[in-house]
């Protein structure tokens, strides 16, 4: 019986891990253990060592109060890996946690095979991470086609598998979705994404609500959809919706329906922006972090944009309002501009689709199948 130890530190990594496990399950004699979420637990006989929300943290300053707790979780994870006598360690994204675990494990178990899924964005900042990963991992699976050369040139075996959004089926029939969700055909629908972490939600919510309130003055037929990453998030958002002037509804675990049915989206920067683009919905992106974290990020990064669509295009296809520009009046003005101009909305969708095609979207590529095939043939 071969044992694979997985570590996923956030929902996007859990999604990838779940699909990889699903593709590995066809091989009898494999056992899965480690840290993950609902997708990994549903995919196989997998029970997480602890909930991934414990390590789902972001930012440089925001993470400081949790450092002692994270160190204890790293210690616990390393001990669990050693005791599990795993044949292969697979870490997924969440470099702040997974890299530290892998580095410790490499010293203690120098012969253990180790794979990391989701290449760190060395093309954006901290290029030296490529060398650091080469010292620890046996193989790296990249989601973007241009990433492997950054790592192979420093001696790390890096394979392009494709982006996990390719694993999903996106909704196309907006009329049918409106009927299913009982939304009148005359309503204008704005999808609002706030993030998967409580801190992100609380940071963006007041700004986003103020922006929506401003739009609702001009659009009386406005309905807001809040797709929830977790049902508990409704209780976080609800107190901010007292005395509001617009209609709203929550959709739990139905984010792709929320993206597809909407006329426009106001999105917190992240993987969700790719999913919204793949759903054929135009958007405005906004993002804000702690000011000290932002200063550190600005000193490190080499790119102008935060949305992957814009980064690859080298231009602002999707309007971005980051940090000091993440203001309700600026956001609402741009949303109004797009709501009132169908041609601008259409142009964004068309340009975004071309970028998605560069990423392999609509190519029938299955990243998890490719990853599982490499794992089975070369590492077990």
From Swiss-Prot:
It is an enzyme of class 2 (transferase). One of its GO terms (molecular function) is phospholipid binding. It catalyses: a lipid X + a UDP-2-N,3-O-bis[(3R)-3-hydroxyacyl]-alpha-D-glucosamine = a lipid A disaccharide + UDP + H(+). GO terms for biological process: lipid A biosynthetic process. Keywords: Glycosyltransferase, Lipid A biosynthesis, Lipid biosynthesis, Lipid metabolism, Transferase. Pathway: Bacterial outer membrane biogenesis; LPS lipid A biosynthesis. SUPFAM superfamilies: UDP-Glycosyltransferase/glycogen phosphorylase. It comes from the Bacteria. Its EC number is 2.4.1.182. One of its GO terms (cellular component) is membrane. Condensation of UDP-2,3-diacylglucosamine and 2,3-diacylglucosamine-1-phosphate to form lipid A disaccharide, a precursor of lipid A, a phosphorylated glycolipid that anchors the lipopolysaccharide to the outer membrane of the cell. Belongs to the LpxB family. PANTHER family: LIPID-A-DISACCHARIDE SYNTHASE (PTHR30372), LIPID-A-DISACCHARIDE SYNTHASE, MITOCHONDRIAL-RELATED (PTHR30372:SF4). This is Lipid-A-disaccharide synthase. The gene is lpxB.
């Amino acid at each position: 019986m071969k044992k694979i130890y997985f570590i996923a530190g956030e929902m996007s990594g859990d999604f990838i891990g779940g699909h990889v496990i699903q593709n590995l399950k066809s091989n009898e004699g494999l056992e899965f253990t480690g840290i993950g979420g609902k997708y990994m637990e549903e995919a196989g006989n997998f029970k997480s060592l602890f909930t991934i929300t414990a390590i789902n943290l972001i930012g440089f300053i925001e993470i400081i109060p949790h450092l002692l707790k994270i160190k204890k979780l790293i210690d616990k994870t390393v001990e669990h890996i050693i005791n599990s006598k795993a044949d292969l360690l697979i870490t997924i994204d969440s470099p702040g946690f997974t890299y530290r675990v892998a580095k410790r494990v490499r010293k203690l178990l120098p012969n253990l095979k180790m794979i990391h899924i989701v290449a760190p964005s060395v093309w954006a900042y901290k290029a030296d991470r490529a060398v650091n990963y080469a010292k620890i991992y046996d193989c790296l699976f990249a989601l973007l086609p241009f990433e492997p050369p950054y790592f192979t040139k420093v001696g790390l075996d890096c394979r392009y598998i494709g982006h996990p959004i390719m694993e999903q089926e996106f909704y196309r029939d907006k009329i049918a979705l409106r009927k299913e969700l009982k939304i009148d055909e005359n309503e204008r629908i704005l999808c609002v994404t706030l993030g998967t972490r409580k801190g992100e939600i609380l940071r963006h919510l007041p700004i986003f609500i103020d922006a929506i309130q401003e739009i609702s003055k001009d659009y009386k037929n406005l309905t807001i959809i809040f797709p929830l990453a977790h049902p508990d998030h409704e209780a976080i958002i609800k107190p901010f919706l007292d005395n509001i002037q617009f209609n709203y509804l929550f959709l739990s675990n139905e984010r792709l329906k929320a993206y597809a049915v909407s006329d426009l989206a106001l999105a917190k920067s992240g993987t969700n922006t790719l999913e919204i683009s793949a759903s054929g919905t135009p958007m405005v992106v906004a993002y804000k972090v702690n000011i000290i974290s932002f200063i550190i990020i600005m000193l490190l990064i080499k790119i102008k944009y935060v949305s992957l669509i814009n980064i690859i295009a080298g231009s602002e296809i999707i309007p971005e309002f980051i940090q000091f520009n993440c203001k309700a009046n600026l956001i609402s003005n741009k949303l109004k501009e797009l709501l009132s101009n169908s041609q601008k909305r259409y142009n964004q969708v068309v340009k975004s689709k071309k970028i998605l095609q560069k990423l392999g979207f609509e190519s029938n590529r299955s990243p998890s199948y490719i990853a599982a095939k490499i794992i089975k043939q070369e590492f077990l």
